[in-house]
Regions:
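Non-heme Fe(II) oxygenase catalytic core, chiefly the N-lobe of the double-stranded beta-helix
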Residues: 1-87, 95-96
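Catalytic core of Fe(II)/2-oxoglutarate
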Residues: 83-132
Length: 132
């Protein structure tokens, strides 16, 4: 599934946690790291889309239920079922420019931004593992 892990609504999602901790950050950013963990090759090579080639009209806000693992939950954000976060899925476009990482080794990592509260307009970094 081609997606970005968050939409511009992410700050609203975590606002109860910020309030609980008395935190009022001027900026929130979220970065993802993608790394291969298996020893003998990637069964799902990674693909990353240049955010400058993505149009807002191609994005589909989608609720992802039960987000977060048990040990990551807080009383403020989640119960035993996790919590709901809004992600972007994307329609396909010939305008998308993709970068592929088919032969990463365990010492390589790709870092990319998935949320920035100061970014206007919000530019999601679409990504997906390629199931081949």
């Amino acid at each position: 599934m081609v997606h970005n892990d968050f939409t511009p609504n992410f700050k609203q999602t975590i606002q109860p946690l910020l309030d609980e901790n008395g935190s009022n950050p001027s900026r929130i950013t979220v970065y993802n790291l993608w790394r291969r963990f298996d020893e003998d090759g990637m069964d799902a090579p990674f693909a990353l889309c240049d955010s400058r080639t993505v149009s807002e009209k191609e994005l589909i806000p989608t609720d992802l239920f039960n987000y977060g693992k048990e040990e990551e939950k807080t009383e403020t954000l989640a119960d035993e079922n996790g919590f709901t976060v809004e992600i972007y899925q994307s329609m396909n476009s010939d305008n998308h420019k993709w970068y592929f990482y088919p032969k990463m080794n365990r010492d390589e990592v790709v870092m990319f931004k998935t949320y920035d509260s100061n970014e206007n307009p919000f530019m999601p970094t679409l990504h997906t593992p390629l199931m081949i």
